Design a protein with these regions (language model features):
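Short, well-structured alpha-helical segments that form the helix of a local strand-helix-strand
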Residues: 53, 57-61, 140-161, 321-331
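Short, small/polar residue-rich loop motifs at catalytic or cofactor-binding pockets
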Residues: 85, 212-215, 276-278
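Active-site rim segments in enzyme catalytic domains, especially the processed small/beta chain
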Residues: 69-76, 221, 226-293, 303-304, ...
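Noncatalytic scaffold domains of N-terminal-nucleophile
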Residues: 1-52, 56-106, 112-115
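Extended C-terminal subregions enriched in glycine
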Residues: 161-163, 170-173, 271-272, 307, ...
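Extended C-terminal regions of large enzymes
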Residues: 101, 106-118, 285-303
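Internal maturation/activation junctions in enzymes
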Residues: 21, 68, 129-234, 247, ...
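Alpha-helical support elements that line or immediately flank enzyme active sites
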Residues: 45, 49-52, 57, 125-129, ...
Length: 412
């Protein structure tokens, strides 16, 4: 109902994405012919069919009619810079005995800033450094979702988010030191913040975890070992809920992730890209660089947290792709910062299925814990995995699709 009202309120074209002016009921067939026309234009003209021509004209018109500032020249500029090819960033993970395997371990590849994939890389690197510093033991299978395991991964992600909150922005406008942030020396230094006996007391410069998102992730592979990891999102719910007339889609609201602090690298500015949450993931084997998996976890700021948890579930705790996704997860949430930049609240959300004793022990370590069940579990994201391995020179594929969502793993 909330989304229905948002669509009708946001622009005069809200009925285009509703059925007779209302949200479709369960089981009803919903048609969106105007979106079909937009897809035809994209198929014929590529991205020019979106950033130029009738779609672009309607997009600019609805924004200007509602008092916004957008021109056709802005869209043309974004088509050139906002869709440019980028080089991925990566981190080799060999911790917890993973590097002792014949394949040498795995390398996780993420989209670089302005995306938040660097959070997953930093967190994995910090966990790896903690093991080298002998601050954490080598985990056994029974340690999965134990108090010490969850405390370690939670704290590593909190440290990583602290840095990302400051550094992640548009690299075409402000230099982002990605290589330095995931360097072994820097991560070893950051790992020194970890305390086995209590949660870090320093403020965590995270961002609020969104209970709703309008994200779609899919992955696919072929028999030759080629694969695609793809993600797209309008951000919160239906984004702005503003619909360009005759186009069948809503405009995104990614600008919500800019900072309004004039001294912040991610400060709002014209023709600048904000901190971005959507991140497709891909892993390769270290020894030969061949494909290990393609995967992703939809869900706003849950995404790098999901990447880390799902990857560790497979590599350290030997879970298959479906079991790795089914396993209960945690999500670090955060209140908005106060005027002095300190966080007013930092909550660790735990999914039903995590042992009650573990919940209480995490509270004793100083974590502000809240348990979620039912529909609240949507906070923990919705993931998809395609996994490849070679057994006796035979290529074997497996897949998993998150029970929290409505996807499927389908062999063709």
């Amino acid at each position: 109902m909330a989304s229905e009202k948002d669509l009708l309120k946001a622009s005069p074209n809200g009925r285009e994405m509703l059925k007779d002016g209302r949200a479709p009921k369960a089981g009803e067939i919903m048609k969106n012919p105007t979106m079909g026309n937009t897809f035809k234009l994209l198929a014929k003209h590529g991205k020019k069919g979106f950033y130029e021509g009738e779609v672009a004209e309607q997009l600019v018109k609805v924004v200007q009619d509602l008092g916004g500032y957008l021109t056709l020249d802005d869209l043309k500029h974004h088509a050139e810079t906002g869709t440019e090819p980028v080089d991925p960033i990566s981190l080799k993970y060999t911790g917890q005995g993973v590097g002792e395997r014949p394949d040498g371990g795995i390398e996780l590849w993420e989209h670089p800033p302005n995306g938040q994939g660097i959070v997953a890389l930093m967190a994995l690197g910090i966990i790896q450094e903690l093991e080298k510093q002998k601050k954490i033991p080598k985990w056994s299978l029974k340690d999965h979702n134990s108090t010490q395991y969850l405390h370690t991964v939670i704290e590593a992600l909190r440290i990583a988010f602290c840095d990302a909150h400051w550094f992640v922005t548009d690299p075409n406008v402000v230099k982002v030191p990605s290589a330095e942030l995931i360097s072994e020396s820097y991560l070893a230094e950051r790992a020194k913040l970890f305390d086995q006996k209590k949660a870090i007391s320093a403020p965590v410069h995270g961002s609020p975890a969104h209970l709703q998102s309008d994200t779609v992730y899919f992955c696919c592979s072929d028999p030759e070992g080629n694969a695609i990891s793809f993600i797209n999102s309008n951000y919160g719910g239906f984004g702005t809920a503003i619909i360009p007339k005759g186009c069948g889609f809503t405009l995104q609201n990614r600008g919500a992730n800019f900072s309004l602090d004039k001294d912040h690298p991610n400060v709002l500015a014209p023709r600048k890209r904000p901190y971005h949450t959507i991140i497709p993931g891909l892993t390769t084997y270290i020894n030969d660089g061949s494909l290990h998996s393609v995967y992703g976890v939809m869900g706003g700021f849950m995404q790098p947290q999901g990447h880390v948890q799902v990857l560790l579930n497979q590599e350290v705790f030997k879970l298959n792709p479906q079991a790795a996704l089914d396993s209960p997860r945690f999500c670090i949430g955060a209140g908005m910062p106060s005027a002095d930049g300190k966080m007013t609240d930092a909550t660790i959300y735990l999914e039903e299925g995590i042992d009650e004793k573990v919940v209480e022990e995490l509270r004793a370590l100083g974590h502000n814990v809240k348990q979620l069940d039912g529909y609240g579990r949507g906070m923990f994201g919705r993931g998809q995995i395609i996994r490849r391995h070679v057994d006796d020179d035979v290529q074997v594929w497996s897949g998993g699709s998150d029970l929290r969502g409505d996807g499927a793993a389908v062999p063709l």
